[in-house]
């Protein structure tokens, strides 16, 4: 493997192992699952298994992937990558610490270079409780070897892959990965297509932070960019705008109720207008979303 020359600041990573988030994605145990490969460009594919979406850049210099799904999917993911050129990625970017995006680190980590934001490594070394579960720290070879605080780039197969930190949205370690020349962007779990997102308040996530991050992305992304979400189908800027509108509008409903002195139970009982029914049909149901928003705006 060619020598990697990058500026690094020692980093951090962590994952929740039996849980995921997204339609039909919250299954951590070993089972029969098919990894679907969806062509995005000539040398970028989106792979869908059981957890978060995986992006794969292919070419003569090796494969780079963004996220690596659950450990139960690793063998099938490796087989799908082999069909694209190599069963073992040269580089792996983790968009955040949750296990449905990172458990595959343990399968690939002895041969692949794992890269993530510094907070990801920290979370992996000491995972917080999530959905009432405490997971074990990641083994050393499953931790990011290279970390950063703001951004970094890798150049491979004629493409610049630029990772940019977006603070305190889905978690406190979220990265958006840009395939600059191809105009393809992996947004990790800052983006759930047509569904309410999971915002991990206990891992530094915050609904207002997510709103701010998505607003920034909408302003800066090219109109014709191809967007790979953390969960859901391949998307575009209009999909991101619609998602952002849903988050902003429902967050305001909760904020207005809080200002009126309503309790969380009262807010849940009131619910949301019918037009948000589809958004609450995924992993994050409407009641859970209302609680996430309430907790975010209650935090001091």
Locations of regions flagged by a protein language model:
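Positively charged n-region of N-terminal signal peptides that target proteins for export
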Residues: 1-4
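Accessory terminal helices/loops
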Residues: 8-27, 219-224, 234-300
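Metallo-beta-lactamase
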Residues: 22-25, 39, 62-64, 70-72, 120-169, 171-172, ...
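Conserved beta-strand hairpin/beta-sheet module of binuclear metal-dependent hydrolase folds
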Residues: 36-80, 177-179, 183-189
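Divalent metal-coordination and catalytic microenvironments
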Residues: 43, 57, 67, 81, ...
């Amino acid at each position: 493997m060619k020598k990697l020359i990058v500026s690094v600041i020692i980093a951090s990573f962590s994952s929740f192992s039996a849980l995921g988030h997204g339609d039909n994605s919250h299954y951590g145990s070993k089972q029969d699952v098919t990894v679907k490969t969806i062509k995005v460009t000539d040398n970028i594919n989106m792979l869908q298994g059981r957890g978060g979406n995986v992006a794969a850049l292919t070419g003569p210099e090796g494969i780079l992937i963004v996220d690596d799904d659950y450990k139960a999917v690793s063998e099938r993911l490796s087989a799908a990558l082999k069909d694209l050129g190599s069963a073992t990625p040269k580089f792996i970017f983790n968009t955040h610490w949750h296990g449905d995006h990172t458990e595959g680190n343990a399968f690939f980590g002895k041969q692949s270079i794992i890269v993530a934001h510094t907070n990801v490594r920290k979370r992996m070394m000491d995972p917080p409780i999530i959905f009432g579960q405490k997971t074990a720290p990641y083994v050393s070879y499953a931790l990011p070897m290279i970390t950063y605080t703001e951004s970094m780039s890798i150049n491979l197969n004629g493409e610049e892959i630029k990772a940019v930190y977006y603070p305190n949205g889905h978690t406190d370690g979220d990265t958006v990965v840009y395939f600059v020349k191809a105009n393809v962007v992996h947004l990790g779990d800052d983006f759930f297509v047509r569904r309410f997102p999971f915002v991990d308040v206990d891992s530094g996530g915050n609904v207002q932070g997510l709103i701010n991050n998505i607003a920034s992305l909408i302003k800066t992304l090219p109109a014709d960019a191809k967007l790979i979400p953390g969960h859901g189908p391949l998307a575009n800027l209009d999909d991101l705008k619609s998602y952002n509108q849903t988050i902003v509008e429902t967050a305001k409903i909760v904020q207005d109720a809080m200002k009126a002195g309503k309790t969380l139970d009262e807010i849940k009982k009131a619910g949301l207008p019918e037009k948000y029914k589809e958004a609450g049909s995924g992993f994050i149901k409407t009641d859970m979303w209302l609680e996430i928003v309430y907790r975010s705006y209650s935090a001091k």
